[in-house]
Amino acid sequence: MKEAAGPVRGPTISDLSVEEIMTKNVITVETEEPVFTMVKKMINKNVECLPVTKAGKLKGLITFRDVIRKVVYEGKDPKKMKAKDVMTKSVVTCYNDATVLDVVKLMKNKRLRRIPVIDRNRNLVGLVTNFDLAIIGWDVD
């Protein structure tokens, strides 16, 4: 007698590529942009963080918290400081072909709320956030 096979299942949410759920057309800032201009951009576009790029390559990430800590708290002039002076340089990233499961594990292990998505040439192609994951029913917190 032949053994019955289990149910055939299609791809699950965890098998999705991060490219399918990430935010594309991310608002960025160049390394030489003044912090004052950058903050206006963040407020006008209603975003909490901006990837910092140079010629399309990811160089860092800036959050409102970075601006408060490194500019406001230290009493520095936001018109004289550049994005490169405030950005976090060692940014955790993922590749655009990573699975959602890979990204969820990374976010949980590193306690992150957002991860820039890059291609194999280090070009920024998107940003995946805990909100992007929540939309597909995945809670990272």
Where do the protein language model's features map onto the residues?
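Tandem CBS (Cystathionine beta-synthase) repeat/Bateman regulatory domains
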Residues: 1-141
